[in-house]
Amino acid sequence: MSYVVIILVVVLIRVFIATPVKVDGTSMYPTLNNNDVLIEKKYDKSFDRFDVVVINYKKDKLVKRIIGLPGETIKISITHVGNNVVSKILVNGEVLEENYGYEPIKEAGIAANEIKLGDDEYFVMGDNRNNSSDSRVLGVFKKKDIKGTTSVRLFPLKNFGKFE
């Protein structure tokens, strides 16, 4: 009987509260690495800018950072100054101050033109901006596609703990 209770508790936790999710690829580098195992908080459905979220996309789970919130306008500006690339993310026409991007953005994708987010739409990007399939390529994501937030790394154990 006690095994049944334990199994039931574990199933309920995984279905409703939290579940492990594995990072597939380097799109969130340097924040996260390929094969890191994170805790996805399924109960957290209020999303803020810069939250790291888990998204269901077709048969995959994507781990990305929220850049644009419902109702906002997003645009990525890229200019070349000599051999240097200067990129800016604009939210409602204002430069977004953030330091999550690993390097300057080389491709704006669909965000080369302004994108007006709907009432339940989010614009997400990987921190490794030049090695990420995100909203610039895949389009915006609806709230129902975002399964939860994550801010805790389980494995590898040497990196266990909270991340931003």
Stretch-by-stretch model annotation:
Residues M1-I7:
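N-terminal Sec-pathway targeting helices
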Residues V9-V10, D127:
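Hydrophobic alpha-helical segments, principally membrane-spanning helices and signal/leader peptides
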